Amino acid sequence: MPARPEIIKNLAPDSYYHDWLDNYRPSEYWEKLSPNIKDLDLPMLHVGGWFDTYLRGTIHLYKEMASRSSCPQHLIIGPWAHLPWGRKVGALDYGFAASNPVDELQIRYFDRFLKGVDTGILDERPISLFEMGRNDWRKFDKWPNNNHKSYFLASTGLAAMREDAGILTESCADACTDDIFVHDPWRPVPSLGGHAAFPAGAMERSTIDCRTDVLTYTSAPLTADLHLAGDIIVEVCCTADAQSFDLCAILSEVKDSGSVYNFTQGYVRVNSGEIPVRIVLQSTCMQIAKGNAWRLSLSAACFPAYEVNPGTGAPDGEARAIDAKIITLTVSCGGNFPSQILLPIVD
């Protein structure tokens, strides 16, 4: 079915649907619809989940208000999807500590700022982040930042075929190696868990990582626990034989049993030849246990969480499925192409 069927044009010519298709990229149209908060100054309790579709907006608002507000700002992020706020999301149970604390916290907040009752909330540190893996809360005075460490992609050139071919190292390899994989729009890499699919959360994804249209880069087993908190960025030196292509980046914990559970991901559509491709992943707070490893998985699709890129460069809503192209992508690492992950490491 076409994105602009004649019947919608005839029966709903003034529908916002047409505006959405016309403004399929960030523009002034969307800026005008965004809430104007520059004159807002109120105490706020910001609530989010690591697998919440809207987490980026929650964190952005908290950072904005915390930087200029004269009123207290508090942020709490648990191992949750958008709703409900419970101890289990996806395939994992995060324990009793993850059980919903929000209702009680809201009452304390309202009692303090609406009734003037001293509930002790102003004596607490303003940021509460649930550390997955350790399954307990961590407190911060400000959003973790400036704590990034680079881990570089390295490969034998067979990262699409062998799970031991792509690795993650603390130093960039001297020589450049290319990994090549092929995106088929008729059998796209499926979405599984994360923050953009339903059901959300951490899922066992080793079967997906075995596909030949997925590149995997895995660290060595850790000799000590690794603690992450904050924003994660992936920079990939990637080219393709199409006008446009997508990249999906997923970070997972690889347990010593061989099972693989995702904990954050990001997605980007590339319409230019700019290198490296920068992918901002969902923020996270995660402990990867000693003896386990962590992995980056790269693919050119994550369907149906994101629509398949036809590779034609046609505007969203105008591309036809029949015109979708098979796309060959090349990821380069090492030498002059330092593909890397910027991890937010905390003590």
Model-derived features with residue positions:
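Active-site-proximal cap/loop segments of hydrolase catalytic domains
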Residues: 1-121
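Glycine/threonine-rich phosphate-binding loop and adjacent beta-strand/alpha-helix elements that clamp
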Residues: 92, 102, 114-347
